[in-house]
């Protein structure tokens, strides 16, 4: 039996360990902390508990598939409660603010209908535009999850296949989020709302491949 050592007990390390053990390997996971590490970490002090991991539960289909791969139903282990609104965006020095106001707050819901009046106030026709934007986002998400995300990239040449080149154009991997969003929305506020997800990547919209617009489908469509 082959043995494998995994450094770090975050979700990546734990999932890798589970798949390797299922495949017949003897697996040992090493973690420097007293509790699970990375995004799976938990801080407990004075009777309080803080999740040290992700603030969003993204790509629920991936989590469900992981449990299914081991013959388990994810809903037997966790119960999810959807937040509404999902998040609040703070706009500073926005034009056309009421007298005496120096900022604007926008609550964003995963329920598109609840966003309608707010988005339309920010940009006329925003909801119709958003429907087109999300339809494209859903298509790109489905293509990415079917053809690219599950693939192993063992060599740099794996990135230069004919399929990668042709589908890459459709997935907008050669443009950035800033220019992509501007094609659809004209108001700075709507542009920032659609680019909000980029903060989780720790980079600027101009430096982020437009492929990441798939996060809008995850946000509003899942």
Predicted regions, residues:
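Rossmann-like flavin
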Residues: 93-209
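Active-site-adjacent bridging/hinge elements
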Residues: 32-33, 209-215
């Amino acid at each position: 039996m082959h043995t494998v050592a995994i450094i770090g007990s975050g979700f990546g390390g734990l999932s890798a360990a589970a798949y390797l053990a299922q495949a017949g390997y003897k697996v040992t996971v090493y973690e420097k902390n007293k509790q699970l590490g990375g995004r799976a970490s938990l801080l407990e002090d004075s009777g309080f508990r803080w999740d040290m991991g992700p603030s969003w539960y993204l790509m629920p289909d991936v989590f469900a598939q992981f449990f299914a791969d081991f013959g388990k139903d994810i809903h037997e282990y966790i119960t999810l409660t959807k937040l509404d609104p999902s998040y609040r965006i703070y706009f500073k020095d926005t034009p056309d603010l009421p007298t005496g106001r120096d900022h604007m707050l926008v609550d964003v819901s995963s329920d598109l209908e609840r966003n309608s009046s707010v988005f339309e106030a920010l940009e006329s026709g925003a909801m119709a535009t958003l429907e087109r934007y999300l339809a494209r986002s859903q298509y790109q998400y489905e293509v990415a999850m079917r053809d690219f995300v599950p693939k192993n990239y063992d060599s740099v040449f794996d990135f230069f296949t004919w399929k990668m080149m042709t589908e890459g154009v459709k997935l907008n991997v050669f443009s950035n989020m800033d220019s992509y969003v501007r094609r659809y929305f004209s108001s700075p506020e709507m542009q920032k709302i659609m680019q909000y997800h980029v903060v989780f990547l720790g980079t600027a919209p101009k430096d982020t491949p437009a492929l990441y617009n798939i996060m809008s489908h995850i946000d509003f469509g899942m």
